[in-house]
Amino acid sequence: MGRSFEVRKASMAKTAGAKIKVYSKYGKEIYVLAKNGSSDPDMNLPLKHLIAKAKKDQVPAHVIDKAIDKANGGGGEDFQPARYEGFGPGGTSVIVDCLTDNGNRTFQDVRQCFVKTGAKIGVEGTVSHMFAHQAVFQFAGEDDEIILETLMMEDVDVTDVELEDGVITVFAPTTEFFKTKTALNAAFPDLTLDVEEITFVPQTTTPIAEEDSEKFQKFLDMLDDCDDVQQVYHNAEL
């Protein structure tokens, strides 16, 4: 895994249209976390982390504030998480996470992305067992041993710490996300976390043949165009 884990999500072009989609995805997720918990980030750690992540991705403050205000207002949409799994073009393994207020619509939208690219949507558990659901932190560094020792001293249940090409990657159970982040920030105040998220890390990767690469990119683009799709994880070697 290490640096090559790349949190295999669909990349988004830096166009105005793509930015609007990013803002919409963050706005929806912030709204859900604020509505289902406290709208005060200091009282809701997942919300606090998501807001920090949104700011890092240059989501405007008014988008964040609007989502929180909407949650405080009560009513509104009732979004539920939905996850779909299957095999993408080239035999790749794919997990699609959504937030939806209409499960039937979302399923049909996601299914069409699979069907129109010759992919095959499966049932729950079809490919998720091929991924590790983990907290991942990545930052520049050269001494992975001191990182491991520090986290162990703080009683963090670390899964693995890897060093590759001057980049350190820390893997931990999802339940240890905030404990790991707090320990890293406390021990290394000047540390810049380039990646800090809970994600699906593929246990193995699948090379994409040249004849499948265009179809696979079309598949990702179609999923990106689905309003309800929040994240796409895959094991393709692009």
From Swiss-Prot:
HAMAP family reported in the protein's UniProt record: Transcrip_reg_TACO1
Gene3D superfamilies linked: 1.10.10.200, 3.30.70.980
Taxonomic lineage of the native organism: Bacteria, Pseudomonadati, Pseudomonadota, Gammaproteobacteria, Vibrionales
Official protein name in the record: Probable transcriptional regulatory protein VS_II1504
Organism of derivation: Vibrio atlanticus (strain LGP32) (Vibrio splendidus (strain Mel32))
Superkingdom field: Bacteria
Pfam families per the UniProt record, alphabetical: TACO1_YebC_N, Transcrip_reg
SUPFAM superfamilies: YebC-like
GO term, biological process aspect, one: regulation of DNA-templated transcription
